[in-house]
A protein has these predicted regions:
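Short beta-strands and strand-loop turn motifs
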Residues: 43-45, 98-100, 160-166, 190-195
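Active-site beta-loop-alpha junctions enriched in small/polar residues
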Residues: 49, 75-77, 101, 140-142, ...
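Non-membrane alpha-helical structural segments and their capping/turn regions in soluble enzymes
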Residues: 111-116, 176, 183, 199-202
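Basic- and aromatic-lined ligand-binding clefts that recognize polyanionic substrates
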Residues: 127-144, 148-152
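Active-site beta->alpha N-cap acidic-glycine motif
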Residues: 24-109, 113, 117-128, 133-134, ...
Length: 234
């Protein structure tokens, strides 16, 4: 059962440590996983790890043509190696969030290393894009625990997980499979995770957007699906 609790929409989540590897989280904790169903918004989010530009240009062009804005979780490494695409993201008005610098499993790092991953990425984004990533971050691979969340929170970051995994990271992912999964399971309030390096997601995007439009749903940012003003990228 999906529910929203206040504006922050914080829910208890026991989930996988990565999209492809099930791992029981031994300790309950709260994080943002789902938005407000009454908003009529589905938040499409795109992660950029250490891969190249991938299909990012195609995704940005599709969104630009339709006047849509999403949230992109960017690693500092990706921004450093794709400065023109990174600057286009800001120029197009998208919400920018933090995905660490070099995409490590944060649960394996010391507190100081976690802080460095987040703070240095924010500095890179500021230097290259003229934007900031606070208050949102997404742990690489979805790997997080109570300590990671507490350390991130002390640095001004709130974890944004997802309620629907597109499956675009699978080795044999196809546009049909990605579109089919999203359209079968998506509901207003969902936070959907996709990846800028996925050709399958880029090719599926027009199909997904057309069907959302037919259903009367709107695509928006994390801030919008949470009923908040756009806090990140400022």
């Amino acid at each position: 059962m999906r529910c929203a609790v206040g504006l922050a929409l914080i829910v208890t989540w026991l989930a996988s440590a990565s999209p492809g590897t099930a791992q029981e989280v031994k300790q309950d904790y709260s994080e943002v996983v789902h938005g407000d169903p009454a908003s009529g918004i589905v938040a499409l989010t795109f992660d950029a790890g250490t891969e190249g530009g991938g299909a990012a240009a195609q995704v940005l062009e599709i969104l630009r043509e339709r006047g849509l804005h999403v949230t992109l979780f960017l690693s500092g490494h990706w921004v450093d190696h794709n400065p023109e695409l990174a600057q286009q993201i800001v120029a197009d008005g998208h919400e920018v969030a933090n995905h660490s610098y070099d995409h490590p499993d944060l649960t394996t790092l010391s507190d100081g290393q976690i802080v460095w991953e987040l703070d240095y990425t924010d500095q890179v984004v500021s230097d290259v894009m003229g934007a900031h990533t606070r208050p949102y971050f997404r742990p690489p691979f979805g790997a997080r625990n109570r300590r990671v969340l507490d350390v991130a929170a002390a640095s001004g970051f709130r974890s944004i997980y997802w309620s629907l995994d597109s499956g675009d990271w699978l080795p044999r992912a196809t546009s049909g499979a990605v579109a089919g999964k999203i359209l079968r399971y998506a509901e207003p309030g969902d936070i959907v995770v996709e990846h800028v390096g996925s050709d399958a997601s880029a090719e599926a995007l027009p199909v997904v957007l057309d069907e959302f439009d037919r259903r009367g749903w709107r695509v928006g940012t994390v801030s919008e699906v949470l009923g908040l003003r756009q806090e990140a990228s400022r």
